[in-house]
Amino acid sequence: MSLTNEKIVEAIAEKSIMEVMELVKAIEDRFGVSAAAPVMVSGSAAAAAPVEEQTEFTVTLKEAGAKKVEVIKAVRAVTGLGLKEAKDLTEAGGILKEAVSKEEAEKVKKELEAAGATVEVK
């Protein structure tokens, strides 16, 4: 006796829910399988989390270069510091601006590099 898949489906459709549940249990026992839906394994939490784009930047003066006077003038213009403070910052290097937008950080970097300084934006 050969049953087609269609005849099997029709026979199952005629059964009540309780009878179908008993059939499923019998199939699980007979073949050693489980009818439970497989659990989805997600990737690592870091991979699932969206990457946040940096919105605040820090502009740091690394080196004044050969045109120290031009760099001091640029530092004064950018920071609003007095002559002595701008000179000290230019000679020692350090943070010029903190928590600024990307556009402002790029503008400051461009001005100082035009004066001959080495600048880093983080």
From Swiss-Prot:
Alphabetized UniProt keyword annotations: Ribonucleoprotein, Ribosomal protein
According to the UniProt entry, its GO molecular function terms are: mRNA binding; structural constituent of ribosome
- What SUPFAM superfamilies would the database entry show? ClpS-like, Ribosomal protein L7/12, oligomerisation (N-terminal) domain
List the GO biological process terms.
Answer: translation
Q: Keyword check for Membrane, yes or no.
A: no
| GO-annotated cellular components | cytosolic large ribosomal subunit
Tell me which Gene3D superfamilies the record gives.
3.30.1390.10, Single helix bin
| Alphabetized Pfam families for the sequence | Ribosomal_L12, Ribosomal_L12_N
HAMAP family tied to this protein: Ribosomal_bL12 (MF_00368)
Q: How does the record describe its quaternary structure?
A: Homodimer. Part of the ribosomal stalk of the 50S ribosomal subunit. Forms a multimeric L10(L12)X complex, where L10 forms an elongated spine to which 2 to 4 L12 dimers bind in a sequential fashion. Binds GTP-bound translation factors.
The record's comment on protein family reads: Belongs to the bacterial ribosomal protein bL12 family.
Q: State what this protein does.
A: Forms part of the ribosomal stalk which helps the ribosome interact with GTP-bound translation factors. Is thus essential for accurate translation.
Q: What is this protein called?
A: Large ribosomal subunit protein bL12
In the UniProt record, the gene name given for this protein reads rplL
